[in-house]
Amino acid sequence: MWLICMAALFDMLYCSEVEESMERIFEMLHGACGLETEEMRGVLKRMSDFRTYVLFPLILHDDKLVVSPDMGYKDIEKEERIYVEKIIKKLPSLVWQSMVFLYIPEHDNWILGLMNTVFDTSSSRFSDSVGIYKKSRGRSEMRLVDLMMGMFRNNVSMMEKFGRGLAHKAEVKMKEIPNEISKEEREKQKEVLDKIREYGKSLGTREKQEQILKAQEIVFDTCIYLWRREEDRISFVLKVYLRSLQCKMLGLNKGALADDVNQEVSLLHSISHEILINTHNEYGIEVTAELIKRLFLEYMNIDEEYVSNVVEDVKKKKEEERREEEEEKKRKEEVVQRNVEELLRGEEEEKKGAKAKRKSKKKKKGSKKPEEKESEVEEVSENREAQEMEDSREACSKERNKEQKNESGRCYYKLHKRTLLWREEPEKIKKKWDSGTEERWKGKSIGEIREQKELHDISEISQLLKSQDANNFFICTGEYMKNGIKRWKMVAIAVLETRDWKKLGVVEVGLFKDKDEQNVIFHLMFRPTDLGRAGAVVRSALAKVDNMEKVDDTDDSLDISGFTYPKNTRSEVVRGLNEFRVVWRNPKNTAEVIRSLTVMSRPGGN
């Protein structure tokens, strides 16, 4: 937990105004993490460096995203405009910080002071940033990315001034190093100040200025590209929602810094400009888009090795998509072939029927041979059996239609037996997995099985899935093909609380259609997260992939359209407007709550 808090602290220091005291920040995070001030200072010292930043073109408010990269002022919801204007006024300062900010613990006061002095004393055409954003540019309205890119270009003129001041001040500080300290300590201080001086000089070069602008332009263009894809939009929205809930759980949503935690911390991200530009030049928009998406979703140290992993992941994804397209094409061809064969058989039967009819007219009534009578009886018998089967299906269908009519909007699902297994005792679960075909579950200890049971034994969620308001809670991913079976996922934000812990995360539901075109739930679990892993969990949950190589659709799956739980399963369901809660109680003492799972309504802004 303390690493999570320190990550939040480190980002806040990069984003907060100078007048925000570090003591106030330390005090706030001490309450959330339990770390002492000196411990936090020590971690910060180890984390400090000359990292470079990029800024995401988004505006967040509470638990939702209110302005997207390509959004103009007129498209913003009216009730959000006052808040958005407040953030727009802060954007020039935030853009400036992202371009030149560096945090060196021993020198943070004078560096931050110089940075603000240069910004405050320099003229800017974006002093009325709200007015500029409201204005239309030609026939098209100014988008958020256009506004922010203009701010970056405007701030370039200040970089040389700040760089000169930084280099000069570092030289002055070198001369002020006291002689009383040890030679080793003096060399350390001089080394740090020399790096600051060289960094200041680099800010005045055209090469450095163009690199900053190019990196930011790539981020803006890539965000526009990502925003056109629904799956990526959803991942951004879910990350914002999870981040907001986590801040509330850590107590970081209170006081003057609440907006900074939710707004600025989510927008500023550290990445090497050189790596970003080289990746874009070498691999193009698809790899860059995946890299930028992961940068937003996850706390990752992006280096050359990480980029190589992303490249491989994109290649695998494209190959999987190619296989899916081939499978889908093959499936369609098979359907066409079956239809053609059925049509030909139908035509052949019609010809035979017409021929038999002509022959029967020539014969006198009652002149049929015994063999023909026997054949006719067999045919009638077969037809009657088929008709009875069809009548049975129609009756079942009418009953289901009747139920659908009474409960309009409800969906029907079956629970696969691998999902139902988690309702058993850990010993029985282990025995079943050890003798099964899923390698990843073989050999697990009873302790591991017991831990996984807490996350997987949530079949009561099926009641929410089949309800009329399921879409108010679950986000559905796109369909994908695997081993010739159409699959998809449904994801919802939730909180699972046991007697020992309380965690935020997502409920994952994996589904496929069986041979009868019925929806079957083959995967169901709560996947916990923390502040640093929120994006990773979102990315995993929304990915069009699963680790089930084969799902046997001939297995008996439980139809849950009329499902009720055994009497010895002490659980209750509480439905609210914005949440669905399942409470599991001790069968021997119903006053004792063993677990509770609260599924929250899906976030707005998507």
From Swiss-Prot:
Q: Where is the composition biased (Basic residues)?
A: 354-367
Going by the entry's taxonomy, the superkingdom of the source organism is recorded as: Eukaryota
Q: Where is this region: Disordered?
A: 317-401
- Comp. bias intervals (Basic and acidic residues): 328-353, 381-401
What Pfam families is this protein classified in?
Answer: DUF1609, DUF3654
Q: Which family does the entry's similarity section mention?
A: Belongs to the UPF0329 family.
Q: This protein is called what?
A: UPF0329 protein ECU06_0090
